[in-house]
């Protein structure tokens, strides 16, 4: 992977780390210090908005990442040509971005675009194979649609905006809210440890669960139509000829379609399947024909430094390969 893309993927990793624990305090403290709505500084809360509580507000940086609902304002203090904000919600949520106020000069080359998912140097999540819309329809350009599309909802728990502002003082204000997603499909995990169940009820689509960490992952339950158990098949045999299966992918980029197939599961197996993946990015992907109700339950944890320092001794092979 190119050094620039690797650096940007590491930026996402740093941002995800900053969303956890004490690191979040630093972001919120900085947000309060730069709050463009000082009269609400004392009442703004980093928690998700509750009914009757004031809307959380803060300024946006040129490059930013948010996991909070609220109202966010970007005002250019100088010419800003390469800006982006990454949004991430809980796995079971959609993200809605609403334009409250936009003051940009489209004729001069300003840009304000929403992208349904995340994209870095052409690598997308969800991939083109997994998203219900073609790539061109995943972009919503304010300069093309104006306020006729004032609210834009994502198809999964991540979204982003790109913007370019030439004139100092110009910018925009958006309100970000989340809505429940009864059957979450494509997901980026905010945390390096967790447990999740992907369910796809009679829908012909693919779902990817993304973990941007090296992890140990254990698949404890798999239901693919009439199958009740698990079998791990080496990728040379493959499950591609079967309409419903689960893949484990590893890589260093963002796009699951460009990642290495480590293993696939499509037949019964006694007991859980467990493996360690030393890649920067691990994806569990479920392919569904639409003929069945498919379900996979798994848990994952971030690998410890000592496990990565001695990969062969900890069942982690080279080139991000995994073993049982």
From Swiss-Prot:
Subcellular location: Secreted
Glycosylation sites: 206
One Pfam family recorded for the sequence: CRF-BP_N
Matches recorded under SUPFAM superfamilies: Spermadhesin, CUB domain
Record keywords: Disulfide bond, Glycoprotein, Secreted, Signal
Cysteines engaged in disulfide bonds, as pairs: 62-83, 106-143, 185-207, 239-266, 279-320
Molecular function GO terms recorded: corticotropin-releasing hormone binding; peptide binding
GO process terms (BP): behavioral response to ethanol; cellular response to calcium ion; cellular response to cAMP; cellular response to cocaine; cellular response to estradiol stimulus; cellular response to estrogen stimulus; cellular response to gonadotropin-releasing hormone; cellular response to immobilization stress
N-terminal signal peptide: 1-23
InterPro entries in the record: CRF-bd, CRF-BP_C, CRF-BP_N, Sperma_CUB_dom_sf
GO cellular component: axon terminus; dendrite; dense core granule; extracellular space; microtubule; multivesicular body; nucleus; perikaryon
Family: Belongs to the CRF-binding protein family.
Record's function text: Binds CRF and inactivates it. May prevent inappropriate pituitary-adrenal stimulation in pregnancy.
Name listed for the protein in its UniProt record: Corticotropin-releasing factor-binding protein
Organism: Ovis aries (Sheep)
């Amino acid at each position: 992977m190119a050094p620039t893309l690797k650096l940007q993927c590491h930026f996402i990793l740093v941002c995800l780390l900053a969303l956890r624990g004490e690191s979040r305090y630093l972001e919120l403290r900085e947000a309060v210090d730069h709050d463009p709505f000082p009269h609400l500084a004392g009442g703004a809360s980093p928690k998700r908005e509750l009914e009757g509580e004031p809307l959380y507000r803060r300024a946006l940086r040129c490059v930013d990442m948010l996991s909070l609902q609220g109202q966010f304002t970007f005002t250019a203090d100088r010419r800003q040509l390469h800006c982006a904000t990454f949004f991430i919600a809980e796995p079971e949520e959609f993200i809605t971005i609403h334009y409250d106020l936009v003051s940009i000069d489209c004729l001069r080359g300003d840009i304000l675009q929403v992208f349904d998912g995340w994209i870095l140097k052409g690598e997308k999540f969800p991939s083109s194979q997994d998203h219900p819309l073609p790539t061109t329809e995943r972009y919503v350009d304010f300069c093309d649609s104006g306020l006729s599309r004032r609210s834009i909802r994502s198809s999964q728990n991540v979204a982003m905006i790109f913007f370019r502002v030439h004139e100092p003082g110009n910018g925009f204000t958006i309100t970000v809210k989340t809505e429940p997603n009864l059957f979450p499909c494509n997901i980026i995990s905010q945390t390096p440890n967790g447990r999740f169940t992907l369910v796809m009820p009679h829908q012909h689509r693919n779902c990817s669960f993304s973990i941007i960490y090296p992890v140990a992952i254990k698949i404890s339950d798999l239901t693919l139509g009439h199958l009740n158990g698990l079998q791990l098949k080496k990728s040379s045999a493959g499950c591609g000829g079967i309409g419903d299966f689960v893949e484990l992918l590893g890589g260093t980029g963002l796009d699951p379609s460009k990642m290495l197939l480590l293993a696939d599961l499509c037949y019964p197996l006694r007991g859980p399947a467990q493996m360690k993946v030393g890649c920067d990015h691990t994806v569990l992907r479920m392919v569904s024909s639409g003929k069945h109700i498919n379900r996979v339950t798994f848990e994952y944890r971030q690998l410890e430094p000592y496990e990565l320092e001695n990969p062969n001794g900890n069942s982690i092979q080279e080139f991000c390969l995994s073993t049982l």
